[in-house]
Regions:
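Short beta-strand-to-loop transition segments that serve as allosteric relay/switch motifs
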Residues: 1-3, 23, 97, 278
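N-terminal membrane-insertion helices
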Residues: 12-16, 167, 250
């Protein structure tokens, strides 16, 4: 004998059933609350990300600037900015933080502030990126890293300085349509990989009609319905086509990427910056 009558067992069964339903309802409620909180966090992260991006291209004597940014459905860590460095100089910055979601957006926001600080206190752009990398490592972002590239323009000089920290190749489109990779030998590791790494700057002579092209992997890795990436070869081919301004170069790239993707849902933010010298008239 277990001490329970049939009536007792029926009552216990009823209580158990009610308790089970109560637990299910509580779990469903908790999940709904968690989903709503996650949605609010994503919306906040998206607003933070959008607030850090430039609203219009800058003006700097002797240069024309075109930019494009479009967020993917998932929040990513793409970031670009224009940072004045005194009366005649301007830094064009582009970065891609590893990962997605709220945490990537937070790392991007911190990196954005750090970039402005290091470029403000260190005039030598290569040394500034070396300081930036050390700061990134000290921040303790676990296994996060960021690819990064900065181009420093000077309205009093034809020489442009480029420092790349593991970012995708920087391209120089010359006035004759030829395309070359900039700073391949000087390119360094991504930020957050080696705290002792020392970065180097490449120098590029930009004459009238030439354009420097910066982009994130939302461009180069855009997928079509066959799961084929857009790729760097196709990008270089499009860059070599006739174009009379940085805006024309940029729009031609965007049209071709869209043609390739043909409406496929993107998983990465798409960022493109083209900086050029006006063509001689």
């Amino acid at each position: 004998q277990n001490g329970f009558s049939q009536d007792d067992l029926e009552v216990l069964a009823g209580i158990t059933g009610q308790a089970g339903k109560a637990v299910e309802q509580a779990t469903a409620h908790d999940e709904k609350v968690a989903q709503e909180q996650f949605k609010r966090d994503l919306e906040l992260a998206n607003r933070v990300q959008q607030g850090l991006l430039p609203s219009v291209p800058p003006e700097i004597k002797g240069f024309e600037v075109f930019d494009f940014y479009e967020a993917a459905h998932q929040i990513g860590g793409d970031y670009f900015s224009y940072i004045p460095l005194g009366e005649n100089r301007l830094a064009v910055v582009l970065a891609d933080v590893s990962g997605k979601g709220v945490s990537a957006a937070l790392v991007m926001a911190a990196l954005s502030a750090d970039v402005r600080y290091t470029l403000a206190i260190e005039a030598d752009v290569a040394k500034a990126v070396t300081l930036l990398n050390s700061s990134f490592m000290r921040s303790g972002w676990d296994d996060r890293f960021a690819t990064f590239v900065v181009v420093v323009l000077d309205s009093t000089s034809d020489v442009v300085k480029v420092v790349s920290a593991g970012h995708l190749p920087t391209y120089l489109r010359k006035a004759d349509g030829s395309v070359e990779t900039v700073g391949l030998e000087e390119a360094g590791l991504p930020l957050g990989v080696d705290p002792t790494f020392v970065y180097e700057a490449a120098e590029v002579n930009m004459i009238a009609g030439s354009t420097i092209v910066l982009y994130t992997d939302g461009i180069s890795e855009a997928m079509n319905h066959k799961n084929e990436t857009y790729g760097l070869t196709r990008l270089q081919e499009v860059l070599s086509e006739p174009a009379d301004s940085p805006a024309a170069v940029g729009r031609r790239v965007l049209v071709d990427v869209e043609r390739h993707a043909a409406g496929q849902v993107r998983s990465d933010d798409m960022c493109l910056v083209c900086v050029g010298r006006p063509a001689s008239t």
